[in-house]
Amino acid sequence: YTVLVQEIIDQLAETKYPTHVFVPGGVGGLAAAVAAHFHESLGKKRPKIIVVEPNSAACIFKSVQRDRIMKAEGNLDTFMACLSAGEVSPIAWPIIRSSVDHVIAIPDAAAIDAMKILAMPPFNDQSVNAGESGVAAIAGIISCDQKND
């Protein structure tokens, strides 16, 4: 995962680093790797890291709220199947705890809407065929925009 982040850093001029990065949650491995690499590479210039996960499997959200690893309770079924994690990875947790700025939980409908937008984009943009879990970050961005957060 860190190669992905390094490619982003290498391709962007220092004045064009992202201010915010939205990352799918799951058990937290991707989120931890992204957060850690931006932190190590950019220090205080690093972007805000926002983790996005499904409402029904919001283990990172609950863990951050309680400041300890928490299991997601109840039915973990979600349209975003690859993010249906019941518990944060104990390896990822210390990094998430110290380097993630925000965590948001979204409904399945947000992922469905994001898939539709990417498949049939406005303004004649190129379409993107993305899966249910892959659109979580985009759905998180749209969700924040709709709430004016």
Locations of the language-model features?
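PLP-dependent amino-acid enzyme catalytic core
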Residues: 1-149
